[in-house]
Amino acid sequence: MYPGILHEITPLNEHDFMYVADRHKEEFTYPIHCHEIMELNFVENAAGCRRIVGDSIEVIGDYDLVLITSSDLEHVWEQHECKSRDIHEVTIQFRLNLEEKNSPMRTNPFRSVYEMMMRARYGLSFSRQAIMKVYPRLMAISSQQEGFYAVQELFSILYELSKFDDACQLSSSSFAKVNVESES
């Protein structure tokens, strides 16, 4: 890890599968960081904010949805030129073992999700159409009191996102520190 990059200790303990933070804030203040677990981060009402994922630097529009599955991929959302005073952010942190050969994620029902998760090692940004498809689920997941149903909702979100072919890889392969493997 490079100097100045925070290694975040997430709120998940060894028996937790996921953690959801749904917050409204006036500005982005959290520093550039990375963490051991996967993250799906949704931001709305933050046009002009700067998103940095690895070596990708972009100014976002009103909606942003990014999936990061690499523990070494640093990322941050910065205030930059965002004028909004009511930024809405939903962060879903979760753990899945994609490396295990017998993982259910490698079976046919999960194939599209697995492939998307592998691409997300570089960070994936989703189109507005994909975001709008899962928007109601993103809004509902944080209020889900039953853990099982929240996990079910997360898998539904991931599956719906995996059906969109237009997700944009954010970081370059050299910067993302990812071993490129092929199953062909």
Go through each PLM region and give its residues.
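Generic protein-terminus/edge-of-domain signal
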Residues: 1-67, 72-75
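A hydrophobic/aromatic-rich effector-binding and dimerization subdomain
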Residues: 2-12, 70-137
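A structure-centric signal for secondary-structure junctions around beta-strands
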Residues: 37, 86-88, 151
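Long, contiguous hydrophobic alpha-helical segments, chiefly transmembrane helices and signal peptides
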Residues: 41, 90-91, 154, 158
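Short beta-strand-to-loop capping motifs
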Residues: 44, 94-96, 143
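Alpha-helix N-cap/helix-initiation sites
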Residues: 59, 110, 150-151
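Short, Lys/Arg-enriched, Trp-marked, Pro/Gly-tolerant hinge/linker segments that flank
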Residues: 124-129, 143-184
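Amphipathic alpha-helical segments within well-ordered protein domains
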Residues: 138-142
